Amino acid sequence: MVEGIKLQSVDTGATLVLDMVSTPDYILGSVDWGAVESTHHSFKYVNQIGVYVAGTSLETRSISITGWVIAENETMMTNRKRVLNRFFNPQGAIDVFYKNYVLRFLPNTSVKYSATIADNNEVVCKFKIEGYCPDPLFKEKTESKVAAARIVPMFHFPLVISKTPKPPGGIIFGLRQPSLIVAINNSGAVDVGMKIIFRANGTLSGPSLINVNTQKYFKVNKSMQAGEEIVIDTIIGEKKIQGTLNGVTSNYFKYRDLGSEWLQLSVGDNLFRYDADQNAENLEVYVYYNNKYLEVQECY
C-alpha cells in the first residue's frame, strides 16, 4: 500500500502532497500504479511450429489516484476544490513522486468527484484522478553522476609549507585521475540514454567517449579552449549537442563526427574510455543518467 505521494505540475511547478496521515487538507485514499503491458513482435515461416519473436516493445501505463478533501464548512470545501480544479488539467503533465522515484502522467480528465452526498458534502469529498503515462517507467529522482576524468582537489587547511616538501617539487593542489576507463552501472530494467559533458581545462581537440565492449563511440570534431564545455544528450526524444564558452551557449550539432552513435547505457555494467585527438590530459568527462524501473512499489 502507498501511504504518501507528492504531485508536481510540470508547467507551473505547483505541488500537492497527499498522505494518509500527515496532510490535513487532502488525504490520500489509494494509488493504483497499473502495469506495463508488452507487445511481442513475431513472424513465422510455412510449416513452422510456433513463431519466432523478433522483439518485444513496452507499452504505456495507466494510473489511478483517489483521495479525500477535508474541510470544516462549505466555503472552505469550495476553496479547496478550486485548488484541485486548477491543479489537474489534461493539457498539463504531472510528476508523481513516490519514495526515491518519479513517474510522469497526463490526466485523462478533470477531477472526478463522488456523486453521493455521503462522500461529497461540506466536510468531506472523495475525488479521483486517472492518468496516462506515455513513458511507463519510473525513474530515480536524482541523477546519477560518474566522473570519467576529473581533477581531485588536494588543497586544504591548515596549510603547512615545508622547506623540504615531500614529494619534492612543491605542493600538490590537484591530482588528475590516472585511469582512462570508467565503469558505469545501470541498475534499472532497461537501457537508458545519458548526458555526456566534455569540459576543457586547457586547449584540446576531438574529445570522444568510447564503449569498450561494443567500440561504439561519440566524438565531437572541434578544438576546445580552456573553460569551454560541451553537453551531449543521448536520451531518446531529447538528443542534442550544445557548447558553452564565455557564458554563451551555441548549437554544436554540426561538429558531431559522422560515425558517432547516440550511446546508451545497457542494463548492468558498462565500460567507457575517453580520449581526444590532442591534449587528452586537458579533458574532464562527466556522465549523468537516470536508472529506470518497471515497478517500484514497496511495503508502504
Tell me what each language-model feature is.
Residues 1-42:
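Polar/acidic, low-complexity leader/linker segments enriched in S/T/G and N/D
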Residues 2-9, 94-96, 206-209, 239-244:
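Short polybasic amphipathic segments
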Residues 6, 66-114, 271-273:
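Short, acidic/charged, Gly/Pro-enriched secondary-structure junctions
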Residues 27-64:
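Short, solvent-exposed beta-alpha or beta-beta edge segments that form flexible loop/patches at the rim
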Residues 50-72, 122-136, 270:
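Oligomerization/assembly interface segments of phage tail-like spikes and tubes
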Residues 95-140:
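Short beta-strand and beta-hairpin "edge-sheet" elements
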Residues 139-147:
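Short, charged, solvent-exposed linker or helix-capping segments at domain edges/interfaces
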Residues 146-300:
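Intrinsically disordered, low-complexity segments enriched in serine, threonine, and glycine
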